[in-house]
Amino acid sequence: MTVTVTDVALPLRVAPNRRHLVDQEGRALLIQGDAPWSLIVNTTYEDAAWFLDQRRAQGFNVVLINLIEHLFAADAPRNLSGDEPFTTPGDFTTPNEAYWAYAERVLDLARARGIIVIAYPSFLGYPDPHYPGYEGQAEGWYDEVVANGPDGCRAYGEYLGRRFGRYENIIWSIGADRNPENARAGLEAMAEGIKSTAPDLLMTAQMMPEHSAAEHYPNAGWLDLLSTYSYAIIPRLLERDWNSTPTRPFFLVESAYENEHNSTMLQIRRAAYWSVLCGGNGHVMGNKPIWMFDPGWQDHVASEGAANLARFGAFFRALPWSTLVPDFDKTLVSDGRGEARGLNQVGAARSDDGRLAIVYIPERRAITVETGVLAGPSATATWFEPGTGQRAPGGTLIVGGPVVFTAPFPEDAVLLLETAASADNGG
């Protein structure tokens, strides 16, 4: 599936309402992301270029990348040329020019294609390493962050900011897969070091699953946006980040990966549609053969998950999605919402002017929509099937009272209600 995506006028900034990321022309960025974590260390330059070309054609505009990889590569932390990231292993103050020059070349590939890179300087790794095939091995740089201390981490951050500050397509991400714990001082110093030499680039932070940077760094001046991370009740976590203070934009950085932990396409679609309709800015998917670039990963680039994300991106970019306000108060969908703490919850939102409403229904069932919250005397209903892209008319209805809808599709469905033509708002 080939998708046309509007180029983003970089650099990005936080919108005045603090809910979205916008480019220099004021267009909101809808994140349709992928997680090729080991792109720098476990692919050739030619393969990296080919991969990014494919993702761009599929509508992906964001990738997650580890700048340094601790475990998940053929010869981590070395790249395929055998270059170590540091001349003294584990010492963040000794960057190896050969390694970082190649990292620049890979980031140049993304920049040339208009792809935003969420760059991780020191992925911490899960505290109880148990990934199949890598059990008991440190997945990330937690111990090294602690050992380098604030001074070494600050120097590393300053180096990264000087080296990559000109890359307007970078968003920095601090930590990942683990809460700060004893690494807090080093991580904060690293973040401050990056900001001191690259002050115009945005920054987020990733915690353990089910935790938020809003809990651990509530008042950090360097924290521009939040990365929601959940394998469980995703809408609950998204609502938490929506309600956190101070207000910051957020996106779903990780959830179920394709071809991992018995995930299904329905799980992947649910995560994506919830990520917008629960107030966020989009979703980053992952795929097991691709994220660490296992042998044969090329055969999985045109996967079903990628096609689902392409349809997700195309659907929302055709609408003024950034005007949507999530229906946490249940004034739009009054019945059929699903279990409050379950995986079958609707994702529902309406525009602030009442001319657009969207409801994602994770399974086939009836829902009741209170049409009185919509503007205008009538609304047009359209059904969209996320798994195929098929559309079906839902009729024209008089706005005013409750209306019961049941999707014509066997699995998940999106109900689109419009009282006026929608303009493109994509990025």
Please place each PLM-identified region on the residue numbering:
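C-terminal edge beta-strand
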Residues: M1-V5
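Carboxylate-rich, divalent-cation-coordinating active-site regions
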Residues: L10-V14
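Active-site mouth of glycoside hydrolases
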Residues: A15-L225, Y229-R236
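Proline-centered flexible-loop/turn and helix-kink motifs
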Residues: G165, P199, P246, R317-P320
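Short beta-strand segments
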Residues: S173-G175, T204-Q206, S227, F251-E254, ...
